[in-house]
Amino acid sequence: MSNKVKSDIEIASKAEILPVTTIAEHLGLDADALELYGKYKAKLSYDTIHSLKDKETGKLVLVTAINPTPAGEGKSTVTVGLGDALSKKDKKTVIALREPSLGPTMGIKGGATGGGYAQVIPMEDINLHFTGDFHAITAANNALSAFIDNHMQQGNDLDIDGRRIVWKRVVDLNDRALRKVVVGLGGPIQGVPREDGFDITVASEIMAIICLASDLKDLKKRLSEIVIGYNYKKEPITVGEMGYEGALTLLLKDALKPNLVQTLEHTPAIVHGGPFANIAHGCNSVSATSTALRLGEYVVTEAGFGADLGAEKFLDIKVPALGKAPDCVVIVATIRALKMHGGALKTELSEENVDALAKGFTNLQKHTESIQTFGIPYVVAINKFITDSDAEVAKLEALCEEHGIPFSLTEVWEKGGDGGLELADKVIAAVESGEADYKRIYDDAWSIEEKLEAIVTKVYGGIGVELSSKAQKQIVEFKKYGWDRYPICMAKTQYSLSDDPTLLGRPTDFVIHIREFIPKLGAGFVVALTGDVMTMPGLPKKPAALNMDVDENGNAQGLF
């Protein structure tokens, strides 16, 4: 390979891309199994998905990470590279990823399809509008908002209290100006004035429902169970009571179908759904993972941000819906993130600092312990960056060996699948060891307080939770309605094990502050909002969009 560092879009645009029908053939599927979106993208038809239901499932590998820097630590890159490496080991492999959100793409990340020589393609299409799933979810979400406001305008038979509507509008962008808005202004014919707000699309309950629904029937049932707000007696009102679950299902019927694409090395990739892991459950769809498990011998998937967020939610929320636990977990660690956790300034992460690396190692240790709590074998993937010094690499390897942590130095960004062959060997060994003995860290029958304590003490390393007066009142209300039986989905900063983004490394003796709960009954969980986490992000001072353009031939520039 050339010594010149090429951008992701340069690498992707020069790659040989096979027709998606050829990729399907690798999986034993013919063209009739696909609904084509051009030559290189397709949805898997419902008939195809149903025909696979009785097939034996393959082995499942979950990729997670330590607490990241703002730029991310390469989870998607390692997921893709490991998938390609397993393919090189003659394992029939399928990768299952989330779809990127336009908000972070235009904001800070510039894209989310892997990186370097470990990418899914067509990269430009996937990072932008892809097959329209997010637009369908946005439309369905906002249609429900329109139905709610229209119901209030047209007599309000359900006595919806406009002050207690919890359903928000969404847009798939980072737009802080829309966090709080007032709708219905302009006089009697314009609607009923009320406070409203926007979340980013990936935080929508409908996104979570798409990712947890098993089929159309389940989708419709889940949509009917969405709580949109409360009446004047403070009783919950659902979509089913309003009667719009059928219309919403109609809008989402194609968005529920998984999307098939490929990696640079032509490993099949099913890319579907995209909830964030800090404000939602952070996993791709059950439909995508389940289908992949019936098409491949090995399936490599990922869960957002660190093991305290995406992996915990995968293991406590997605696994029960999927009916299959991981056979191995890969924890991605980078030297730059460990240096940050050891006290190095974010502006100095490219500079050698072995002492900071050693201090930050405790963050990695905590995540390995958390995964062991779930009873699953793991391997640490040291995702090598070109800024890592030999001394830093040697120090991290020595620390892993000293503490008995299985690891592999991984160079898939630079070398593609060839850079992950050792990691593939260690993953195969872990899977074939049969050591996986999955166990959730709490039971659904536990109280909300007990579930919170389990997550905070066993996964975060804290000492307990502190509930606001609002959260305490909500728990009493939730018990009355039986909502305390649902799993907990923590909305928390991704940068720290605590709810304070400045508390790095492996903090101890901290409590998690729960400010309020949001019942998401259609998704099947209760969201616990901690700290200052927001469900509508803002843009940075210099968004990645400043460097994006298109040439005279319509080719994208500036995606990375």
UniProtKB/Swiss-Prot annotation:
Protein residues bound to ATP: 69-76
Pathway note: One-carbon metabolism; tetrahydrofolate interconversion
SUPFAM superfamilies given in the database record: P-loop containing nucleoside triphosphate hydrolases (SSF52540)
Membrane-crossing segments per the record: none
The protein's Enzyme Commission number: 6.3.4.3
Keyword set includes DNA-binding: no
NCBIfam families for the chain: PRK13505.1
Protein name as it appears in the record: Formate--tetrahydrofolate ligase
Gene name linked to the record: fhs
